[in-house]
Amino acid sequence: MKLIPFLSEEEIQKLQEAEANSSKEQKKTAEQIEAIYTSGQNILVSASAGSGKTFVMAERILDQLARGVEISQLFISTFTVKAATELKERLEKKISKKIQETDDVDLKQHLGRQLADLPNAAIGTMDSFTQKFLGKHGYLLDIAPNFRILQNQSEQLLLENEVFHEVFEAHYQGKQKETFSHLLKNFAGRGKDERGLRQQVYKIYDFLQSTSNPQKWLSKSFLKGFEKADFTSEKEKLTEQIKQALWDLESFFRYHLDNDAKEFAKAAYLENVQLILDEIDSLNQESDSQAYQAVLARVVAISKEKNGRALTNASRKADLKPLADTYNEERKTQFAKLGQLSDQIAILDYQERYHGDTWKLAKTFQSFMSDFVEAYRQRKRQENAFEFADISHYTIEILENFPQVRESYQERFHEVMVDEYQDTNHIQERMLELLSNGHNRFMVGDIKQSIYRFRQADPQIFNEKFQRYAQNPQEGKLILLKENFRSSSEVLSATNDVFERLMDQEVGEINYDNKHQLVFANTKLTPNPDNKAEFLLYDKDDTGEEEESQTETKLTGEMRLVIKEILKLHQEKGVAFKEIALLTSSRNRNDQILLALSEYGIPVKTDGEQNNYLQSLEVQVMLDTLRVIHNPLQDYALVALMKSPMFGFDEDELARLSLQKAEDKAHENLYEKLVNAQKKASSQKGLIHTALAEKLKQFMDILASWRLYAKPHSLYDLIWKIYNDRFYYDYVGALPNGPARQANLYALALRADQFEKSNFKGLSRFIRMIDQVLEAQHDLASVAVAPPKDAVELMTIHKSKGLEFPYVFILNMDQDFNKQDSMSEVILSRQNGLGVKYIAKMETGAVEDHYPKTIKLSIPSLTYRQNEEELQLASYSEQMRLLYVAMTRAEKKLYLVGKGSREKLEAKQYPAAKNGKLNSNTRLQARNFQDWLWAISKVFTKDKLNFSYRFIGEDQLTREAIGELETKSPLRDSSQADNRQSDTIKEALEMLKEVEVYNTLHRAAIELPSVQTPSQIKKFYEPVMDMEGVEIAGQGQSVGKKISFDLPDFSTKEKVTGAEIGSATHELMQRIDLSQQLTLASLTETLKQVQTSQAVRDKINLDKILAFFDTVLGQEILANTDHLYREQPFSMLKRDQKSQEDFVVRGILDGYLLYENKIVLFDYKTDRYDEPSQLVDRYRGQLALYEEALSRAYSIKNIEKYLILLGKDEVQVVKV
């Protein structure tokens, strides 16, 4: 069809007016209409939380398709695979609806083609696009298309370590080994090895991977801070700060003398106050920096006289105490600032003195990093395995260096769209620039929700365009979506109240003004005073505890507060548990939260990413078992294995065995002592009684058999042999939380199998890999198990982004911000490059022998201090945005939960607000969310804030006050009469006589098989057959049935049956790792694991499998793996119509997606067919059985059923 012109500004305005005057219940806002229809220039849509940005994107795409644009001409980048799937589903519905509504034949045909092409559209993450791009164009850089992605963190770490040690050895033995040795020692710390340097190298490498060209950034920007260091300018800045601080101090003391000092006329401290004022008065306009520094030194010295009490107002008069306390508090604040400035003078002097040495160290570091980056890049090319960032770098390299490729994409894409633009990093931004023609970008995001700085996302990319487009519309169009269609007015008012007073350009990176404030738009939610946001504080004064370290007890109090509110919502207001979310900034306290909820019987569902897999007890036992099999001379691991439930040695037995040392040896490992005990070669052999000797023999025999088995067999087989030999898998299944424990053990075997499939072989390397993961303080993700259906959601704020819940509790408001980055030896900045702490060796000048002649001094470089200030502002801004995301998840009511001493919090004093914002020092000195909220509550008391605070003490949190969860026992009342045995043998004999009569009457029931499979009874549902049940099911077992025998086939060619292909295909679909990007190479590797012959493998069409995952259903499965269940066995009781007897149906479901209110069931079929309807009729009954089983199991009636037909050249997905 011909392209239909896009709307002009005048036409858009008319559309806005028509919409405003329409009688629609839910109208589009003027800004939404503008965002949907504006064209011909770059557009930035700043979409606040809940403003309908996904709706706008979908409508804009639909409008462009309706005007003749092809879906293949749109590049649409989403932040997650799930978001891409949801957008495709939304588009599928909208396009289908448009086709039904229009009478235009050309448009119908055009939209029909777009619907067919939708699965292949460029809608997805940047990672998925770059993978496909490199697969297609990688040959330009000599990259084979069958590359794989290094998604396994342990494998990546192993490769990284190997390359690091190679580069390390080359530098350690190279020409510059002396300067390199200095670099090594600079980061060695107490460890005195390479680990400190390695940690910093990996940190810098991760940062480099987020740049569009790592080597270029290393050469151009890494040393930028050293090159532009200006100590004269820094001294001038410091002098200005000293000048201002001294003036502030003078103003404070003069005010005190003029107003309050008369109350303390004879106080000794006033003489020292006058001395300080005299010192400050000695300064004038001609005073230089030296003079200011000298006065500062004398003022600080005076304050430290009399053990620091020279300026303290020590008045004890009750009526004057508040006045004295206020003076003393302010004086401390003033001198704390002066003390910091005094320290900065000394630090700046050291920085200048050691600047040359630090720069030399940085150059050595730059050389090492350059070699490491290149060596690691080459190693990954040899392995043909890359990180996602590598794929992006190669994509950029091709687009930059091959104009014909770049121009073909620029010509192809009518528009380059990106969602969640605030979380874009510099690689992605460069790629978007290269794909665009310069004026066809559509960017949607919200800088207030940029919370992925730890992944190198840079909100300033968004902010720079926001400011530029706002100032100059010729640069691009800025559209603001402020209306919130998600939350109640109470939630929005509270959020606005907080951020209007908290966030500005100085601290927060944006000014929270009318461009960013949330506007209530959900007319379905009427105002309700009960939904006013609450700031709940557990009062620590009531606990009687003084130890700050006793966090567990205090958190329990906070959690009891939360549990009380949850039970109130659930039992008094009828709120389902699944409508409640508990949000945390980190998972550090999740164990205590889960324990508290469990104690009160409240069901909970976590976000499934605990990342404490290696810390689970059952996995630790297995890892120690593998360590012992590899090397039994490891005492800790050996004791752990012996004490484990697999062998159950107690302390007494281990003590007896540990005393079995040979007389002629000074030291022996425990294993050697066990050998001595078996040989009775110790003087303490009398301690080994018969029972212990037999137990020891069994242990040693089993251990020897495992060690022997490990040599020729795979890790997977070894692990399962251990499980089976000692019934350990079954044992953990009987423990509390058994299914999760078994899932962990099952995952250990699978991870070992994946490890060996990744070109890494052997028990030794597997153990080394695990130890490296633990050493790096990393962990593997815990294994998910089926969550309860109605449960409170516990998740991190990061995980909650994009979600919404009626009731939201933000927990741990008192948890301190993570400032680990600011304590690092290295801080990086895109503007300044490397900031580093330099370890200087200084002479002390000490004469006495007991004093050290030299000391080591850690001196932060000038760039380090600059980067530290930049990092502090960026970190606080990110924490503000994190709080914003958390608060805007709530639909109805918001609870902010913290704890603290009421007395101390009420006594806190804060500087006055400035321009309606908290004082910048108040904001920058906050340690947690609670400090911000409390300061706002106190400073803006008169403003009638839309959230209230209240303290809850122990007296309100007793077990009786909290209450209990009302539960009904599922057990029926039992009657002992039902269990009485016959009193006499006579009664038993009479019962036996009745058996024959009973058997005759119920012959049909006796002949009914007690267990049947869906394939046996699917014939019940075939329209040409009898529906009676027993007779049909019994046909397969009929005595009168003719028996036929196949003649033997003597041909040498291996025959492959359809059943074999079907079984192998099912096993393949079960084994596919859906957490990784699916490629032909990864499927080929998975196919090798399938237990079948090579002839069968050759018959399986992997392209067809890949094609399935490009369908709408396939994409839905990939995007919802946390809801996915594969190869699930089931049993179901059914009643036979003829005999009226129950029988069991057993089968295995190929897979299903379990959502809250629906289930998507799918079944693979490899049968040959002419028309899909043939298989639909054939398997309709079987799917009906599956549907019944799922419906009974989950009490869900909405079940979608699909057949995935693999019997033809092209895969077909048919809804039944």
Swiss-Prot record:
Q: Does the keyword Disulfide bond apply?
A: no
Positions of the UvrD-like helicase C-terminal domain: 515-802
- Which Gene Ontology terms describe the biological processes this protein takes part in? double-strand break repair via homologous recombination
Query: Which reaction does this chain catalyze?
Result: Couples ATP hydrolysis with the unwinding of duplex DNA by translocating in the 3'-5' direction; ATP + H2O = ADP + phosphate + H(+)
Q: Where does ATP bind?
A: A47, S48, A49, G50, S51, G52, K53, T54
**Is Ribonucleoprotein tagged as a keyword?**
no
A Gene Ontology molecular function term for this protein is: 3'-5' DNA helicase activity
What Enzyme Commission number(s) appear in the record?
A: 3.1.-.-, 5.6.2.4
Ordered alphabetically, the record's keywords are: ATP-binding, DNA damage, DNA repair, DNA-binding, Exonuclease, Helicase, Hydrolase, Isomerase, Nuclease, Nucleotide-binding
Cofactor entry: Mg(2+)
One Pfam annotation reads UvrD-helicase
Q: Which residues form the UvrD-like helicase ATP-binding domain?
A: 26-488
The record's listing under InterPro entries reads: AddA (IPR014152), DNA_helicase_UvrD-like_C (IPR014017), DNA_helicase_UvrD/REP (IPR000212), P-loop_NTPase (IPR027417), PDDEXK-like_dom_sf (IPR011604), PDDEXK_AddAB-type (IPR038726), Restrct_endonuc-II-like (IPR011335), UvrD-like_ATP-bd (IPR014016)
Top-level taxon in the UniProt lineage: Bacteria
Instruction: Offer a single GO CC term for the protein.
Output: DNA helicase complex
Quote the function comment for this protein. Answer: The heterodimer acts as both an ATP-dependent DNA helicase and an ATP-dependent, dual-direction single-stranded exonuclease. Recognizes the chi site generating a DNA molecule suitable for the initiation of homologous recombination. The AddA nuclease domain is required for chi fragment generation; this subunit has the helicase and 3' -> 5' nuclease activities.
* Cited PANTHER family: ATP-DEPENDENT HELICASE_NUCLEASE SUBUNIT A (PTHR11070:SF48), UVRD / RECB / PCRA DNA HELICASE FAMILY MEMBER (PTHR11070)
Could you say which protein family the record assigns here?
Belongs to the helicase family. AddA subfamily.
State whether it acts alone or in a complex, and with which partners, per the record: Heterodimer of AddA and AddB/RexB.
Q: What is this protein called?
A: ATP-dependent helicase/nuclease subunit A
